[in-house]
Amino acid sequence: MELKLLQDNGQIGAGVAASAEVFGRDYNEALVHQIVVAYQANARSGNRKQKDREEVKHTTKKPWRQKGTGRARAGMSSSPLWRGGGRIFPNSPEENFSQKVNKKMFRAGMRSIYSQLAREGRINVVDGFAVDAPKTKLLADKFKAMGLDSVLIITDNLDENLYLASRNLPNVAVVEPRHADPLSLVHYKKVLVTKAAVAQIEELLK
């Protein structure tokens, strides 16, 4: 199969040969959903904290005697049943949100994403992608000439000027093939891959 070549003026050029094993697979929506959710979960860190009955600052004195008042028995005001008491199952920063995804499943999911991008015309090959200086304006003007506004660039050799120029653009990311993740692939409207990076992707996902 072939991936379309995108020229600097935004025009589509000749096709570039690509492996059907990576870019020609059927779309598995359930698997893609699973690896995207797992990626988000594994990037999550615990930042919630609630107190249980041991941590709430309350007196441990018994509110009233056990029997004879007609009220329900109570041990202390830090009980989760009381207003201002501790939580029964409090959230903690030590919570583990990670989800395990087997390597075989992950590679199959990534192949499914790349294949769907190719079918939708959202992935194109470029001869190379570089800027002369680490200037955001140079890169922004280049994208404007190509008619792009939301771009993930997958390059075989991460150019420092390109990386620095892209950091201040909100809808642009630059990564190497081994760092391409499922969330970024489905998030950006257009994915640009250098010719050498296509071979690296095929090697990673074979």
Swiss-Prot record:
Stored Pfam families: Ribosomal_L4
Composition skew (Basic residues), residue ranges: 59-70
Renumbered residue ranges of the record's region Disordered: 43-78
GO BP annotations listed: translation
Presence of the UniProt keyword Cytoplasm in the record: no
Signal sequence interval, chain numbering: none
A GO CC term attached to the entry: ribonucleoprotein complex
UniProt-recorded Gene Ontology molecular function terms: rRNA binding; structural constituent of ribosome
Source superkingdom: Bacteria
Composition bias, Basic and acidic residues: 49-58
UniProt entry keywords in alphabetical sequence: Ribonucleoprotein, Ribosomal protein, RNA-binding, rRNA-binding
Family, similarity comment: Belongs to the universal ribosomal protein uL4 family.
PANTHER family noted in UniProt: 50S RIBOSOMAL PROTEIN L4 (PTHR10746), LARGE RIBOSOMAL SUBUNIT PROTEIN UL4M (PTHR10746:SF6)
Function: One of the primary rRNA binding proteins, this protein initially binds near the 5'-end of the 23S rRNA. It is important during the early stages of 50S assembly. It makes multiple contacts with different domains of the 23S rRNA in the assembled 50S subunit and ribosome.
Quaternary context: Part of the 50S ribosomal subunit.
Protein name, per record: Large ribosomal subunit protein uL4
Organism: Cupriavidus metallidurans (strain ATCC 43123 / DSM 2839 / NBRC 102507 / CH34)
